[in-house]
From Swiss-Prot:
The keyword Iron applies. Pfam families: Frataxin_Cyay. Keywords: Iron, Metal-binding. GO terms for cellular component: cytosol. PROSITE patterns: FRATAXIN_1, FRATAXIN_2. This is Iron-sulfur cluster assembly protein CyaY. SUPFAM superfamilies: Frataxin/Nqo15-like.
């Protein structure tokens, strides 16, 4: 007999992980609010970050795939949650490394984010 997966529980855990990530992103962006012009908004689990040069970074959840997607000027990235971190499924880099680099490039400032 096949064991049914509890997708409701898995989805609840996914939402917790996504909420946690979005809160950490907000906290980190707010650290720089007096230093650089960054605006962001969140609507339906889509975060749009706008820099003073009008470039965008967009982060959203892909619930059916249980992934986070990140779109930057440089590329698009898909992240799976592995070993307590979001890992890019192509480069095996963690989310924060790619996100921090993209924000630094798009803001023309060296940004360092606290990941905890």
């Amino acid at each position: 007999m096949k064991k049914k997966l509890n997708t409701k529980k898995e989805n609840n855990n996914f939402y917790i992980l996504v909420n946690d990530l979005f809160l950490k992103i907000e906290d980190n962006l707010n650290l720089y609010e007096n230093e650089i012009d960054i605006d962001y908004e969140i609507q339906d689990y889509v975060m749009t970050i706008t820099f003073s040069n009008k470039t965008l970074i967009i982060i959203n959840k892909q619930e059916p795939l249980q992934q986070i997607w990140l779109a930057t000027m440089q590329n698009g990235y898909h992240f799976d949650y592995k070993n307590n971190q979001w890992i890019c499924n192509r480069s095996n880099k963690n989310f924060w490394e790619i996100f921090e680099n993209a924000c630094s490039i798009q803001s023309n400032k060296d940004l360092i984010f606290c990941k905890k």
